Amino acid sequence: MKIAIVGAAGRMGRMLVKMAKESKDLEVAAEIDVAEGFAREWPMDTEAVIDFSFHSAVPPSIAKAAEQGIPYVIGTTGLSPEEQTAVDAAARRIPVVQSGNYSLGVNLLLNLVKIAAKTLGPEYDVEVVEMHHKHKKDAPSGTALMLAKSAADGRGVAFDDVAVYGRKGMVGERPQGEIAIHALRGGSVVGDHTVMFAGDVERVEITHKAQSREAFAAGALRAAQWAAGRKPGIYTMRDVLGL
Ligand SMILES: NC(=O)c1ccc[n+]([C@@H]2O[C@H](COP(=O)([O-])OP(=O)(O)OC[C@H]3O[C@@H](n4cnc5c(N)ncnc54)[C@H](O)[C@@H]3O)[C@@H](O)[C@H]2O)c1
């Protein structure tokens, strides 16, 4: 299967190219990046595009894939609402897999967090803490947002009504039902996430630590193979994994 990697010069892109070249089922049709020495376009016989680049790069790239009928896998995070609308429009014409995290472990965690939130209820305060390397550009991480949304789902509340991003100053006592997200940055951390359920007499913590970008790249390559031949629509990594 011929795949194109968008953002091929980046941390994730380099890992994707390396793993795709090692796979007997995949062929790298194009390594696309704005960096010098990289391609700007994929060939017409490309069978899937995997995008781990920059939020503003996604709309023009996915629009081109939609015109050509090529499935698209989005790993890039931090999309604005307008950019997300462009993705949704493309998904009416091609299969699109979009996930803030392609690792098996985090996708399992999403289900565990939903169950925990439902079981423990709003008496347990939910705080999501994430840490990433100092080069990460968006905050909080797409994964932290997905985890916080899973907690909101488990409680049956609308995430936007209860979300809080960090705290500073005289914020007052913590109201019940809030779901707060905190982003730490430093060093070379690949991606750590903890969801805390803090009760009055006990605390439950669910943690995932990615040790290598291989965890994300393997999932994205699997998603590209899964997407080929699907009906147009927007899918998540949970669909790919059947979770
Ligand atoms: N979903 C996941 O599992 C997952 C995992 C890790 C990272 N990410 C996300 O993937 C993205 C990339 O992460 P990274 O750590 O590899 O970043 P990075 O900065 O190392 O790489 C991004 C690459 O994209 C390139 N790029 C920028 N604009 C472009 C354009 N218009 N066309 C083509 N290429 C362009 C840059 O030149 C760079 O080489 C980020 O949004 C990050 O949050 C997602």
Predicted regions and their residues:
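Rossmann-fold NAD(P)-binding glycine/threonine-rich loop
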Residues: 63, 67, 76-96, 107, ...
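C-terminal substrate-binding/catalytic lobe of Rossmann-fold NAD(P)-dependent oxidoreductases
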Residues: 2-44, 122-243
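Short glycine-/small-residue-rich Rossmann-like dinucleotide-binding loops
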Residues: 53-54, 77, 183-185
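Short, acidic/turn-prone active-site loops that include or flank metal/cofactor-
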Residues: 34-36, 77-80, 101-102
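Rossmann-fold dehydrogenase core element
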Residues: 71, 86-103, 121-126
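Short acidic/histidine-rich motifs immediately flanking catalytic phosphotransfer sites
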Residues: 42-50, 66-72
